[in-house]
């Protein structure tokens, strides 16, 4: 049973995260203006990035940076977080396209290509990626070296060692029989790499030690796997904001091993993630408490 002190601490973390979430959404609103009523690409960019979402990656970037003792100006750090969310939004727009996952619903709304057409959706995704890198390159309060390193981390997460590779593997192998290891590798590219970039960007700005950066890398790898396993477990549930049963006929760990075994694996990944996170952030625990509370709430809904 949670003590009064612990409950108050968790409530504070939730309140803090809500405040950061508001900051992220306000800044995204500023960074993604629509020039005119005819600016369909701009409107699609805004809808893709500002549709109601979890904002887990930018929240973790901000929380981890603070736990690491980051002294960068709030504006510069916030811009890095928003850039991560733009990359994530761009990847979702592309994932949902008819030639890929052919999804009709995302974040409780019609997908971008359903609203604006495929041509606008593709252009909006490319423009979001371009905007994200520009925002990082111009982030206030960071040294030129820090900005360049942050751009490199984000670039790595997008390309053939990240989101692009993950989506290609999912499209080319997802409907074929696969081993658990092959599925985990796809999950790594699809999900873990952007978490890794988020944590490494926080580390860069906070000037964290090499050991802390390595621990955060390991945290991100495990967190990404846990996140993807949770996504697989909730496929078919009505309140995810996405098309139900998207994984039918796909070789996921849930289909291979069953929900109970996957939940056990998920909790193992969370435990490992927690150990690495606490090793990296020894003077701040906001990130740890946020991750634990978020997953426990989600797991309670599927148990």
For every predicted segment, state its role.
Residues 1-32:
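N-terminal amphipathic/basic leader segments beginning at the initiator methionine
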Residues 37-299:
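Mg2+-dependent prenyl diphosphate-binding active-site environment of isoprenoid biosynthetic enzymes
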